[in-house]
Amino acid sequence: MRKPQRGYARQDRVKEQIMRELAELVRTGLKDPRAGFITVNEVEVTRDYSHATVFYTILNQDAREITEEVLEHARGHLRSELAKRIKLFKTPELHFKYDESLERGLNLSALIDQVAAEKPVED
């Protein structure tokens, strides 16, 4: 018989902890000067904790490719530092993915504003 869940599931707690630690590591641990201001937005972890997809955004959109290279180059270092901070049976393999949800939201907001400006307000 399955136990009822209390509060957060373990996987959610692990995701939150990985996200916090990676955000700190990216902020303080990346020595590459090409790495701009990177924000870790979300982390998705597989059920067996073998893989973690890290969704991030950057302040300077022009440096998107460079930031991707920097993160890929630092992936092993970030994983080993994460292993020191989080006690898991297996530290997940990190996969970095640019989070386009913010851009999509801004584009959608701009479209709504455009339609609202074109349509006269009726009383």
Curated annotation (Swiss-Prot):
SUPFAM superfamilies: Ribosome-binding factor A, RbfA
A GO biological process held by the record: maturation of SSU-rRNA
A Pfam family: RBFA
Tree of life domain: Bacteria
InterPro entries (UniProt xref): KH_dom-like_a/b (IPR015946), RbfA (IPR000238), RbfA_dom_sf (IPR023799), Ribosome-bd_factorA_CS (IPR020053)
A single GO molecular function term of this UniProt record: ribosomal small subunit binding
Annotated TM spans: none
Primary site of residence: cytoplasm
Example of a GO cellular component annotation carried by this entry: cytosol
Keywords: Cytoplasm, Ribosome biogenesis
Keyword Membrane recorded: no
Protein location: Cytoplasm
Disulphides: none
Family the entry assigns: Belongs to the RbfA family.
Biological role stated in the UniProt entry: One of several proteins that assist in the late maturation steps of the functional core of the 30S ribosomal subunit. Associates with free 30S ribosomal subunits (but not with 30S subunits that are part of 70S ribosomes or polysomes). Required for efficient processing of 16S rRNA. May interact with the 5'-terminal helix region of 16S rRNA.
Subunit relationships: Monomer. Binds 30S ribosomal subunits, but not 50S ribosomal subunits or 70S ribosomes.
Official protein name in the record: Ribosome-binding factor A
Protein's organism: Neisseria meningitidis serogroup B (strain ATCC BAA-335 / MC58)
